[in-house]
């Protein structure tokens, strides 16, 4: 079971990622948040296998910095950085 955290501030993209995750029986959607700092906090108390993170989230928090922090603290957690142009 792959536990997934979605970090995305746009509701339509949140729903899209949640829908995709639900299609795969091996995936388990743990939580969706709109803030990169909140994602780091969640990783502090939840065993997350994969973080799907927007490069720039609500309040302009930097997804790259948060992703790097998660990878340093939890090396077995994979971080997928996404963006839309």
Question: Whereabouts are the PLM-identified features?
Answer:
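His-Asp phosphorelay/catalytic-motif detector in bacterial-type signaling
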Residues: 2, 47-49, 73-78
């Amino acid at each position: 079971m792959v536990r997934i955290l979605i970090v995305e501030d746009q509701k339509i993209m949140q729903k899209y990622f949640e829908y995709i995750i639900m299609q795969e029986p091996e995936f388990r959607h743990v939580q969706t948040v709109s803030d990169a700092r909140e994602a780091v906090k969640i990783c502090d108390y939840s065993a997350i296998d994969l973080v799907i993170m927007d490069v720039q989230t609500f309040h302009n928090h930097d997804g790259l910095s948060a992703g790097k922090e998660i990878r340093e603290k939890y090396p077995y957690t994979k971080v997928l950085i996404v963006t839309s142009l």
